[in-house]
């Protein structure tokens, strides 16, 4: 007599699996955080006017003079490099240094005094 064929039940196959959707437990989100993650992060504020909209009381970067000139009705002209300038003032905020007096202003062209170049050529 021959021996019976081995049984291929699904329960036997599932018991050897490392992962099963039926036995999966939900992960507690609080267990994923460490004690360091739970601590409140504090940002250190600079004490200069690069992070503010107005010049600080003891401004040394030239922003106070620039604001006084604009309030008096003068126009903002970039003649020479600002003090401590990196040369990227005209490129926009992404390229400006923290002490740039032009922080928050749109990009401009050093050679042109506030004039917009229009391309009047036809696209056809």
UniProtKB/Swiss-Prot annotation:
The UniProt entry's GO CC annotations, sorted and at most eight, read:
mitochondrial intermembrane space
Q: Name one GO molecular function term.
A: 4 iron, 4 sulfur cluster binding
Specify which residues bind [4Fe-4S] cluster according to the UniProt entry for this protein: 86, 89, 97, 100
Motif Cx2C motif 1 per record, residues: 86-89
Which cofactors are named for this entry? [2Fe-2S] cluster; [4Fe-4S] cluster
Please verify whether the record's keywords include Metal-binding.
Answer: yes
Reading the lineage from the top rank, the first entry is Eukaryota
Q: Which GO terms describe its biological process?
A: iron-sulfur cluster assembly
Which residue numbers does the motif Cx2C motif 2 cover?
97-100
The UniProt entry lists the main location of this chain as: cytoplasm
In residue numbers, the region (Disordered) covers 1-39, 40-124
Where does the record say this protein resides? Cytoplasm; Mitochondrion intermembrane space
Q: Where does [2Fe-2S] cluster bind?
A: 49, 56, 59, 61
Establish whether keyword Transcription is in the entry.
no
Biased region (Polar residues) positions are: 1-20
- Region (Fe-S binding site A) spans which residues? 49-61
- Please give the function described in this protein's UniProt entry: Component of the cytosolic iron-sulfur (Fe-S) protein assembly (CIA) machinery. Required for the maturation of extramitochondrial Fe-S proteins. Part of an electron transfer chain functioning in an early step of cytosolic Fe-S biogenesis, facilitating the de novo assembly of a [4Fe-4S] cluster on the cytosolic Fe-S scaffold complex. Electrons are transferred from NADPH via a FAD- and FMN-containing diflavin oxidoreductase.
Summarize the subunit comment: Monomer.
Name of the protein: Anamorsin homolog
Lineage of the organism? Eukaryota, Discoba, Euglenozoa, Kinetoplastea, Metakinetoplastina
